[in-house]
């Protein structure tokens, strides 16, 4: 689960199960599991998932914000790829990098710093858009 939490999006099959079983071994989730989970779901769900160590299904995971999409495909990897292509197909790599960076900054930095960086990104991109429309 910790690896999935580090991703920008999580796509699951209908029969996927999610859990933090570490507590059954006397451990807490590692590798940023708690921190990243707190960024996605309500803190009450975090307590439940970690202390109970119960498995949750993909539908419940989607309802609490842990999973973004549930795929019914026989080929979930390609369906996930197709979803990402559909989201980004007509966007420049620079735009995608800036969107991801701005979202991460909004989550991790103090608001003043995040807004400053976001405004700088916007201005850089706006100049490029203006220049490209004048060519």
Model regions: which residues?
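Crotonase-fold acyl-CoA enzyme core
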Residues: 1-93
């Amino acid at each position: 689960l910790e690896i999935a939490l580090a991703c920008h999006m999580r796509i699951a099959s209908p029969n996927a199960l999610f859990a933090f079983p570490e507590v059954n071994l006397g451990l807490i989730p590692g590798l940023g599991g708690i921190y990243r989970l707190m960024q996605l779901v309500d803190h009450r769900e975090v307590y439940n998932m970690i202390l109970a160590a119960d498995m949750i299904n993909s539908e419940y995971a989607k309802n609490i914000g842990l999973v973004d999409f549930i795929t019914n495909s026989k080929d979930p990897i390609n369906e996930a790829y197709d979803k990402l292509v559909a989201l980004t197909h007509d966007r420049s790599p620079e735009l995608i990098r800036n969107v991801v960076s701005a979202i991460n900054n909004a989550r991790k930095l103090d608001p003043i710093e995040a807004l400053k960086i976001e405004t700088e990104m916007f201005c850089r991109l706006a100049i490029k858009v203006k220049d490209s429309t004048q060519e």
